[in-house]
């Protein structure tokens, strides 16, 4: 049923694209957004006023908070399944010289018949531990029609922005990219980590976290239907005794996981921070514990230690899929229990040097001016 809906959805978009063949190419840029971070960085740079083209921002429901952040820009919130919204989005794209997207959108397939419109993919993460695209484990179970549709979407990307050669190689494999289509500008969302940083104690005060404690941020990846396996890296007892009461464990969960996870209430040692902005949490944290999430790629820009709590690595690799050589790529070693995590914490200098190596490799081109480089490139193409 799902495949049939996807087929008719794709067909509807193609029909709309054909019916709007008369739309003339304009000088505007359309920004199609599903995650706010890259778009926020791009729009902040755009507002500095150095660019000659108008911009139209199309926000999906997940990114609609940006509408309030940029009230002076032309911003529309769209429902990708609403026929009128689809027509509006396709019209805007066909009226653009450049279309910038941050995710997989079937909408971009209308651009394959319009070589005069350049589609630029600015992926919503600056690194990847999980397989996606054509190499996603679940893709093996999809029909040939589904896979052909996936390929048509990936083929619509004329350019892909990358922050490292590692990500360029991943896109080549996961999207089956032929040739060098990459813009080595760095990933826009990383620009924020080069701006003046708010004092960590000020941030702790803002969010009512104890100033005297160091913060361990635990930010695990989303787990599909595996809530029963959710595990905290440390217990309250370990935080009090093994870590000498110096740390607060701040837990940032995906909304779906938050509904099912049982976290201690009114604890002095463990606090649910799932509703707080990730960027602020990263800036105020002294240590990150994650697993297969892309969060470590951002946190590495802050030159702070990272631990990997991978208690379900084999099961996760079977059901979701990890990149090759995951255990060699991560800075440090995978830890399957809290005892291993505590052992790793004894050598902070080694953890720090591993993070520096990791960031050099994965944030090679992200140097604080990614948004400016991207918009300057688009500006030159528009003139």
From Swiss-Prot:
It is found in: Cell membrane. It catalyses: N-acetyl-beta-D-mannosaminyl-(1->4)-N-acetyl-alpha-D-glucosaminyl di-trans,octa-cis-undecaprenyl diphosphate + CDP-glycerol = 4-O-[(2R)-glycerylphospho]-N-acetyl-beta-D-mannosaminyl-(1->4)-N-acetyl-alpha-D-glucosaminyl di-trans,octa-cis-undecaprenyl diphosphate + CMP + H(+). The keyword Magnesium does not apply. One of its GO terms (biological process) is cell wall organization. Keywords: Cell membrane, Cell wall biogenesis/degradation, Membrane, Teichoic acid biosynthesis, Transferase. GO terms for molecular function: CDP-glycerol glycerophosphotransferase activity. It is a peripheral membrane protein. GO terms for cellular component: plasma membrane. The keyword Cell wall biogenesis/degradation applies. Pfam families: Glyphos_transf. Pathway: Cell wall biogenesis; poly(ribitol phosphate) teichoic acid biosynthesis. Belongs to the CDP-glycerol glycerophosphotransferase family. Catalyzes the addition of a single glycerol phosphate residue to the prenoldiphosphate-linked disaccharide. This is Teichoic acid glycerol-phosphate primase. It comes from Bacillus spizizenii (strain ATCC 23059 / NRRL B-14472 / W23) (Bacillus subtilis subsp. spizizenii). The lineage of its organism: Bacteria, Bacillati, Bacillota, Bacilli, Bacillales.
């Amino acid at each position: 049923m799902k495949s049939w809906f996807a087929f008719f959805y794709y067909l509807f978009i193609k029909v709309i694209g054909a019916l709007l063949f008369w739309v003339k190419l304009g000088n505007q840029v359309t920004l199609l957004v599903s995650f706010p971070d890259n778009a926020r960085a791009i729009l902040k740079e755009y507002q500095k006023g150095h660019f000659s083209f108008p911009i139209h921002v199309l926000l999906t429901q997940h990114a609609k908070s940006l509408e309030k952040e940029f009230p002076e820009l032309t911003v529309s919130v769209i429902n990708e399944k609403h026929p009128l919204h689809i027509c509006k989005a396709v019209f805007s794209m066909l009226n653009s010289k450049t279309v910038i997207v941050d995710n997989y959108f079937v909408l971009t397939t209308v651009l394959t018949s319009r070589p005069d419109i350049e589609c630029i993919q600015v992926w919503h993460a600056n690194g990847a531990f999980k397989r996606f695209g054509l190499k996603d484990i679940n893709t093996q179970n999809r029909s040939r029609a589904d896979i052909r549709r996936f390929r048509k979407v990936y083929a619509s990307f004329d350019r892909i922005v990358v922050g490292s050669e590692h990500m360029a190689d991943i896109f080549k494999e996961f999207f089956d990219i032929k040739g060098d289509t990459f813009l080595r500008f760095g990933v826009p969302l990383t620009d924020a980590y080069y701006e003046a940083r708010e004092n960590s104690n000020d941030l702790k005060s803002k969010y009512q976290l104890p100033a005297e404690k160091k913060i361990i941020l635990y930010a695990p990846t989303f787990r599909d239907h595996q809530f029963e396996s959710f595990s905290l890296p440390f217990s309250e007892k370990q935080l009090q005794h093994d870590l000498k009461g110096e740390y607060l464990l701040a837990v940032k969960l995906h909304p779906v996981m938050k509904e099912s996870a049982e976290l201690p209430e009114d604890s002095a040692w463990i606090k649910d921070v799932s509703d707080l902005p990730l960027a602020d949490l990263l800036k105020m944290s002294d240590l990150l514990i994650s697993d297969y999430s892309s969060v470590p790629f951002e946190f590495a820009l802050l030159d702070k230690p990272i631990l990997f709590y991978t208690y379900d690595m084999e099961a996760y690799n079977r059901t979701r899929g990890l990149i090759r050589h995951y255990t060699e790529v991560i800075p440090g070693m995978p830890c399957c229990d809290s005892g291993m995590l505590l052992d790793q914490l004894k050598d902070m200098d080694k953890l720090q040097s591993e993070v520096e190596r990791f960031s050099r490799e994965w944030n090679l081109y992200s140097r604080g001016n990614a948004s400016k480089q991207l918009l300057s490139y688009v500006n030159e193409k528009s003139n």
